[in-house]
Structures are given as C-alpha cells and as structure tokens.
Amino acid sequence: MENFQKVEKIGEGTYGVVYKAKNKLTGEVVALKKIRLDTETEGVPSTAIREISLLKELNHPNIVKLLDVIHTENKLYLVFEFLHQDLKKFMDASALTGIPLPLIKSYLFQLLQGLAFCHSHRVLHRDLKPQNLLINAEGSIKLADFGLARAFGVPVRTYTHEVVTLWYRAPEILLGCKYYSTAVDIWSLGCIFAEMHLVCTQHHAKCCGEHRRNGRHSLCPLCSYLEVAASQGGGMTAVSAPHPVTRRALFPGDSEIDQLFRIFRTLGTPDEVVWPGVTSMPDYKPSFPKWARQDFSKVVPPLDEDGRSLLSQMLHYDPNKRISAKAALAHPFFQDVTKPVPHLRL
C-alpha cells in the first residue's frame, strides 16, 4: 500500500470505502477499494481471494479493469482503473433535460457487450445498479464490481449500513430461488434501461393529470417550463425548476414484498402459463393479488416499438425465456447505434 497515495474518498459502496488514489511509481490515477471484512472471521476468506483473482483475467473495454489485489494482514484492497462518474450521478444531473436516445442506446449496447463477455466466461454480477456502472468523458460505460457478489456475498446493508436497493433485483431472487443464472443480470439491466428514459418531478404526474382532466389542452406549468428551458438551450438547472426534478426507477420498492408487488402491478401477476414453475418457488404465495399486465407504451412512454420489444424481452418473467446479452446485441433496436459523447459535469 506504500505505493499509493490517497487523493480523496469518492464513495462508500456495497463492499467498502472507495478512494481516488495515485500510484507513486507510475503516476497513474486509480480507484482503490478497501473491502470491509467480517471482524469475526480470521483474515480474508480464501474463496474470496480465488474469486477476485479470476476477475483480473476479465479483459474487456466495457468492464472496469481490476489492476491489482493487495492483501495485507486482515485488510484487502482492490485496485481498479479510475473513471470519472457513475451512471446514477449522471442520470441525476440529466434529470431536467433527459438523456439523449443515441446516448442511451450506446450505453445499453456497451453494457450488453460487457455482460455477454462475462457471461461467456460464466461470471455473473448479481448486483447491477446505476451506482456500479461507470462512465468517462469519451462516451464509454463500464461494468464495475463484477464478480464481487460471488466473492463476498450480496449483503443486506452497505458499508454505511444503508439498505442495499432492491429496485434492480430479478423476481426469481425475490421469490427465493437459490439457483439462478445469467438472466438475473439481464433483468437488472432492463430496469436500468427503462430508468434512463424516465424523468419525473415531485407532483408533476398529479399536476399534469389534473391539468388535462380540467379540459386544458395546453401544457401544464412544469411542461411549459421544460419546453422553455429546452428552447433556451437547457441552461436552467434542476435547482431552479418549479419542483425538484429527479429520475424515476421502474420498480422503486422499499421492501421485498413491495418490490414484488410493484413488478406484478406493471407486468401482471405471474402464473404457470407465463412462468412455468413459479407457483412452486419458496416465497410464492397463492394469496398474491392478481394484477393484469400494463401496456408497455404507457409504462415507458419515450420508448419506440423496437425499444419496447427489447425491454419486454429483458423483463420476461421466465428466466429461461429472458433474452441473453448476446441475442440482445442483435436486436433491431441497435441497428443505428453510434457512440456519442456525454456532457459530464466533473
């Protein structure tokens, strides 16, 4: 560790604290992840060492490179390449203007390329979320923390005791399935794909709905504000908006049962027809409310027909029928994919 100088703390993730650091010998800027270990165990589990050592072999342009593993006494440090920002922060910063479709398409395509590579090497992520998708100023997006869930387990709480989000967790996991596949990562990425399209403001949906119900066909105050902001070059900020602007997750549950029910309300309550074997899962209850499937055009309005087709295949209930990363890359949605450069506020 004497070869690294910590510059600043840049985050506290699922497995520990992350620092921006500089290699004193080479001058290279890296992300230094200090893994939080169970104090009741003696040192670092050998299984964890084996798992993360394998990750050093995952060389792909869309996977954050694990440069080194430093094991000292009861501490474990992972040295990763450094990227400017995570997708969550970028989406928050883009909440007022939205993310351009070409950039969403490029990001999803790149992430699927990274997933396809890892899945072909039988490595799952199991905990995909916007916080561990990292971007740079050149338009690249990379998967971070790959394989750490298998090495260290998926904790209930983070380093700072924050409850780990359930928003991107596949229904087979929520229903207690102990043996799952690469399909869990596809589900998570599908949720993130939808979220990149969704922008909301507090009270905006209610405001817009009331405006239209009262027979006024003009734009509601916030829509008018957004239209003016766009016409003026998007120079206004979320802080100056009439209501706080935030992105909206597709399934923002606050407990496992709430998460399941949010999924059911949108995709319909699954039965043996759409998902053979679902009623035999450990946490399935015959008493679950029976909801009908919603029209996808109303769930994610900005998506075109190809986008809705891809999303519905990524969010297929049956993991065996959920589209694979490799197959998704060949979907018509990507026929005009490019690699635009994002406007990052670093």
From Swiss-Prot:
Please tell me where this protein is predominantly located. Answer: cytoplasm
**Effect of gene knockout:** Reduced body size and impaired neural progenitor cell proliferation. Sterility due to defective meiosis; no effect on mitotic cells. Premature translocation of CDK1 from the cytoplasm to the nucleus compensating CDK2 loss. Prolonged and impaired DNA repair activity upon DNA damage by gamma-irradiation.
Which residues are the active-site ones?
Answer: 127
Checking Pfam families in the record gives: Pkinase (PF00069)
Can you name a GO cellular component term? cyclin E1-CDK2 complex
Cofactor comment: Binds 2 Mg(2+) ions.
Which residues are annotated as site, described as CDK7 binding? 9, 88-89, 166
Summarize where ATP binds, as residue positions: 10-18, 33, 81-83, 86, 129-132, 145
For this protein, the Enzyme Commission number is 2.7.11.22
EC main group: transferase
Q: Does the keyword Protein biosynthesis apply?
A: no
| Any GO BP annotation | potassium ion transport
PTM entry text:
Phosphorylated at Thr-160 by CDK7 in a CAK complex. Phosphorylation at Thr-160 promotes kinase activity, whereas phosphorylation at Tyr-15 by WEE1 reduces slightly kinase activity. Phosphorylated on Thr-14 and Tyr-15 during S and G2 phases before being dephosphorylated by CDC25A. Nitrosylated after treatment with nitric oxide (DETA-NO).
Please give the residue positions where the record annotates the modification Phosphothreonine.
14, 160
Q: How is its activity regulated?
A: Phosphorylation at Thr-14 or Tyr-15 inactivates the enzyme, while phosphorylation at Thr-160 activates it. Stimulated by MYC. Inactivated by CDKN1A (p21).
Write one Gene Ontology MF term: protein domain specific binding
Entry-linked SUPFAM superfamilies:
Protein kinase-like (PK-like) (SSF56112)
Coiled-coil boundaries: none
User: Which residues does the record give as Mg(2+) binding sites?
Assistant: 132, 145
Quaternary state and interactors:
Found in a complex with CABLES1, CCNA1 and CCNE1. Interacts with CABLES1. Interacts with UHRF2. Part of a complex consisting of UHRF2, CDK2 and CCNE1. Interacts with the Speedy/Ringo proteins SPDYA and SPDYC. Interaction with SPDYA promotes kinase activation via a conformation change that alleviates obstruction of the substrate-binding cleft by the T-loop. Found in a complex with both SPDYA and CDKN1B/KIP1. Binds to RB1 and CDK7.
Family assignment?
Answer: Belongs to the protein kinase superfamily. CMGC Ser/Thr protein kinase family. CDC2/CDKX subfamily.
What this protein is called in its record is Cyclin-dependent kinase 2
Record organism: Mus musculus (Mouse)
